Amino acid sequence: MPSVLCSPMDFVTVDGITVVGERINPTGKKRFQQALREGDMNYILEQAVSQSEAGAQVLDVNVGAPGVDEPAVMEQVVKALQSVVSLPLQLDSSHADALERGLRVYNGKPIVNSVNGETEVLERVLPLCKKYGAAVVGLAIDERGIQPSADARFEIAKRVVDAALAHGIPREDIYIDCLTLTASAQQQDVLATVEALARCKTELGVRTILGVSNISFGLPCRPYLNTTFLTMAMYAGLDLAIMNPSSEEMMAAVYAYNVLTNRDKQSGRYIARYADRVPASAALAKALQDKAASGVPAAAEAAGPAVSGPYAPLMKAVEQGLKGEAAACTKALLAEKEPLELVLSLIHI
């Protein structure tokens, strides 16, 4: 059976690679932590809206940070999010009290992220999932910590699945997270995640989920690693990808994969997203070709529009990123012009 998640206004059927927006999470984000402590709900809602516009289908919601009353803030954030976005939510916390406060005010069917292989955690959180009708994420980790081998993680996952089924949670609403370890620190264990994921998919018959971006932490050019790892995981059977929906490389991989695996019927979603898009290199080449045909040298077009007169030094400084020079040029111009006059003149260049 398909797994369906819903909000008061929309629903998501997990029938292909489904994107879970990762940005509502204070981990490693000082500005987000500050927003939580100060109750700056506008900042948090901006993160939700931007992810929705970028193509996220579900939003992960994590409000755990030092100095934050997590249960109270979880309730507040869940209420606020439902007023501005229509996406289903994934309530992300290791505290049962925070999860229940969020579940109590959520109108729809969310995901609870997460339980793990510890008996105490299973007995505390699984009844909440059953009570509120939520899907559940099970982490392949227990009292011993993260195990390096695929076999050990699979055995923990099996224990979590058995416990969830025993609590009356349908198999289609169980998502297993085999845990993404950073390639910079545990390179030798990267493939174990993919192998364990594949076994959970085929042998346990459950859905799978991963925090994809964790793979590249501490390494340069992170989108390259994220996109490659995402593709590996999708081929192994990934269902939910917790990722940054603003990453065009990763989103392109998701949409393309759903086409090539016949999950996006008639390529409808892919066409809707990309039909009107032209690759940047092709667009630039066409623009230069059109200018050349009209008698304008390509080099002149590539260099941008020429600016002469008193504003030329300022424009050049801005284009080159010379802050000190730009400030000096601006100061000189302000000796002769009013601020508004200067701004309006630059706008019309």
What positions do the PLM features span?
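Catalytic alpha/beta core domains of metabolic enzymes, predominantly
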Residues: K131-V278
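Conserved small/polar residues in nucleotide/adenosyl-binding loops
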Residues: I347-I349
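Alpha-helix-loop-beta-strand connector modules within alpha/beta enzyme cores
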Residues: E70-S93, D97, L103-Y106, E195-V206
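Active-site loops and adjacent core secondary-structure elements that bind or stabilize anionic groups
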Residues: M1-E22, P26-R31, L210-S216, P220-S345
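Hydrophobic faces of well-ordered beta-strands that scaffold small-molecule active sites
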Residues: T18-E22, L59-V61, L89-D92, P110-S114, ...
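Acidic (Asp/Glu)-rich catalytic clusters
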Residues: S52, L103-Y106, R124-G133, A166-I169
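Glycine-rich, proline-tolerant flexible connector loops at the mouths of alpha/beta enzymes
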Residues: S52-L87, T180-Q187
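Conserved, mostly hydrophobic/aromatic
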Residues: Q51, G102, I176, A233, ...
